[in-house]
């Protein structure tokens, strides 16, 4: 996890990097279908919404759910967005002291 953004546009040009987890092209039945397990989406959204680098973009279907695919909104996504809007400011400090734990403020 500590190298998730290493050698990426997010690292090199964060002001130009729009980060997203899913979009209308990647949902089931679409041309670029990719499967991201529902249990992992809150973790993935945490990484793009709570970190300083990049411009996060939240997929409508993850926020409101996708009725035709019987998919519910992502648990705690609204809370993550609220946390970002209220508390995400100032320079970020990473704490990568342990190989299995990622921390940042």
Each language-model region and where it sits:
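Active-site-proximal helices and loops of the catalytic beta/alpha 8
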Residues: 1-105
């Amino acid at each position: 996890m500590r190298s998730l953004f290493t050698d990426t546009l997010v690292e090199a040009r964060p002001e130009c990097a729009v980060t997203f987890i899913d979009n209308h092209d990647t949902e089931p039945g679409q041309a670029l279908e990719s499967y991201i397990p529902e249990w992992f989406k809150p973790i993935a959204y945490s990484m793009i919404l709570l970190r300083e680098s990049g411009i996060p973009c939240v997929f409508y279907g993850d926020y409101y759910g996708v009725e035709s695919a019987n998919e519910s909104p992502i648990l705690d996504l609204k809370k993550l967005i609220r946390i970002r809007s209220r508390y995400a400011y100032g320079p970020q400090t990473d704490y990568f002291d342990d190989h299995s734990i990622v921390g940042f403020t």
